[in-house]
Amino acid sequence: METVIKLTGINKIYRTDEVETQALENVNLEVRKGEFLSIMGPSGCGKSTLLNIMGLLDEPTSGEIELCGTRIDPKLSDNRLAELRNKTLGFVFQSFHLIPTLNVLDNVQLPLIYRGVRSSERIRLAKEVIERVGLSHRMKHRPTQLSGGQCQRVAIARAIIGNPEILLADEPTGNLDSKMGAEIMELLHRLNREDGRTIVMVTHNEQQAAQTDRIIKFLDGRQIM
C-alpha cells in the first residue's frame, strides 16, 4: 500500500544556553495511505513534537521527511512549507483554535481564503462540510455559542474543507467529556472509512486508540513499539 508519510532517522534536540533536551531519538516510521494510526505515550515523551514534524510545523534536528512521495527539503521557504501544509494536511487540535469573532461558516472557510478560492465556491464547500459534521443548524453561531463537541466538529470541518490527503489530530477529544469524545471519534472514523483519508492521532485514551488500525508507543523520545 502507498506510503504517505515516511520519517527516516528523525532526531529533535532542543537547546538552551545550559540545557540540551532530546525530544525525539532516531524515529523511523511509515504511515500508509488510508490508515488510522494512533500515537501513545506519557506526557513529555515526544508525541506532539512528532506530530508537529509530520505536519511541517517544526523541523527535525536531523533526519528526512517524505510527504506523499515528496522529500521535504530542509531549505524550503516558510511560504512553500505553508503551501504544502495547506494543500496536503488538515490539523485538529485539542483546544480547537477557532477565531471567536467569526461564525461557524467563516471559520470553516479560512483554509480556502489562504488558497485564494473565490467567495461563492468557498461558501458552497463550507456549507457542504458543515452539513457533513452535523452543524448546518449552527452555521451562523460563534464559537462561544457552541458546546465543546460542536467546536471540535467545526475544527474538523475546517480541517477537511480543502480535501487534504492527511488529517493530523493532537488529542482531539482531550477537552471533551466521554459522550462528546465518542461522537468525535465516530466522526473521525467515518471520515477515514468513507473518504479513505489517512488520520494520525495523538491520544492518551487507550480505548480510543484500540479502535484504530495501528498503535505506536513512545517513551522518552523513542519509539518502543
Regions found by a protein language model. Give the residues of each.
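ABC family nucleotide-binding domain
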Residues: 2-219
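Conserved switch/coupling elements of ABC/ABC-like ATPase nucleotide-binding domains
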Residues: 220-225
